[in-house]
Amino acid sequence: MKKRYIFFKGLIDTLDLYTDEYVNICSKEGAECLVIDAGIIDRELIRLKAFLIKEVTAVISLNNIGMHLEFEDGLNIWDQYQIPFYNILMDHPFHYKTALDRAPEQMILLCMDRNHVEYVKRFFPNIKRVAFFPHAGIELQKKDAAYAGESCYVPIEERKIDVLYAGGLSRYAAEGLIPDLGSIREFDAFELVKNALEKLINNPELTTEHVIEQCLQEINFKINDKKLGETIAELRFLDALAVSFYREQAVRILAENGVTVTVFGVGWDRCEWESPNVVYAGVTSPAQILELMNQSKIVLNTMTWFKQGAH
């Protein structure tokens, strides 16, 4: 029987790039693929209903997109039609507590870090199927390369960018995640946040959830896993601050030692420091990053606080 898959795109450019790869792979294997534009989901429901007339093999989605769709109030489509929903998380599960608390029974959660799998098993008992799913890569195709040589890859000696870093400074995005710490009455949230951030920066091998739990234990604040999961999700901005600190320091140290670093992404133009060796090139599309990598001698990458996985 011909396999039939449903995909979602139209919300986040980076996820669209990955989704296109999955669609291409499945299509080459002879599968029938329906790609739903999540940006106009109300108009797309007619196409979705028509596709569901025949048996569907699975939904393949990223970061919960399309997971909570309903044709009728209170009836999740994927549970209603008994369709496996493969949900590939690109980020830590604590960023999606509300969505995952309401996950349909048909969801199979795939995490890109082994620690995230254990986190889900502990803090989301409603999720029965979760597995480690290593992050793959996307190969630059000759049709997409600007280089005119026989290979699509530019020889190292001809590459114009010494060091490339493509990624924003998450500390500015983290500002929007900070809750009203003064409203937390059970403990001194300001002091705990200060201690936790210091621990993360001084011990980068530790996970954010481990440090938050450790700080709570140090003040003898005892809570069950349900409340602990809520607290970790509430303080998840610490993760973004720690990531941003090391991301910024990696670029700054290279620049201060005479290395020219070309950076793309939001936030770099807001840094409190400047260096003639940092070239801020603005924001570009995820697809264009592949070609920029092809023009770079070294591509700098910093893990988003993943300890047993890559991103």
Stretches found by the model and what they are:
Residues 7-9, 15-122, 139-152, 278-295, ...:
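Extended catalytic core of nucleotide-activated donor transferases of GT-like folds
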